[in-house]
Amino acid sequence: MEVSLLLMEQIAQLFIVLLMGYIVVKAKLLKPSDSKVLSVVFVYLIMPCVVLNAFQIDDTPEIRAGLLYSMAIAVGMHVVFLAFDTVIRRPLKLDVIERVNIIYSNAAALVIPLVQALLGSEYVVYSCAFVIVQLILLWTHASACLQGSTKLEWKKILINVNLLAIVAGALLYLLHISLPAPIVSTLSSVGNMIGPMGMLLAGMAIAEVPLKKVFCTLRNYLPVVLRLLVVPVIVLLLLRVVHAAGWISDGKAILMTVYLSAITPSCATVTSMAQLYNRDAAHSSALYVLSTLLSIFTMPLMIGLFEVLI
């Protein structure tokens, strides 16, 4: 349970930063709309720095095996998410906003700082596997669901700055190109802002939403419980059944990196996409807020179960 307790401590620290973001908006020092400026810094500057820095590692057979392993696990997890959605959406009468909030987690923004704290920066590269799979599905499956069509947003997939950063980082890794020390140091310094900046943005988003309505709307709890508890438990049981941790050396630590991505709250990008496609962005925002707040308790619980079962 040591890792679970450490995770709880790290989430508590991030929650304090979230409160800071909430307070600066409520104190009228910033407007909720100011978060859009910070979002640009987060998406187009901080995230690419984290990704590029993650791939500045030595090329060894163990790391290559770990990358292939984490990619296979990430693909498998998303297959489970999509299959689960197919099974439950009609019996539970889930609308499209609820469905995509259950399927897609906030892995990119939340997992990387947690992986850095729990396992070390050398494991961040494995979390990129989940992000790659999710980015592709966000702009294909999620986009099609929200548009109500099968039209694929290939241009948005291919020019997504984080996907481009992953491709660039992977090429540097495969070609054994090490960036100069000052550049690596700069990437690391900027990348270290990912946790605080992500939580500041979450706090500012929460300040914009009437919390009474979020917490008192009972329907909101259904997709949130499915995202934070039911889906993670199903994934965990499947990982145990197939003995996934034993597939490669250091499998448990790498598996935890990918599993952390699967147990995070609803994806913030879904709300932005809901606005883009004229869907119920307020409902999506409410699910994001509720799942983010409740994940403070559920994520340590799920990692505790992971330690016991895997």
Where in this protein do the model-derived segments appear?
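Alpha-helical transmembrane segments of multi-pass small-molecule/ion transporters
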Residues: 1-310
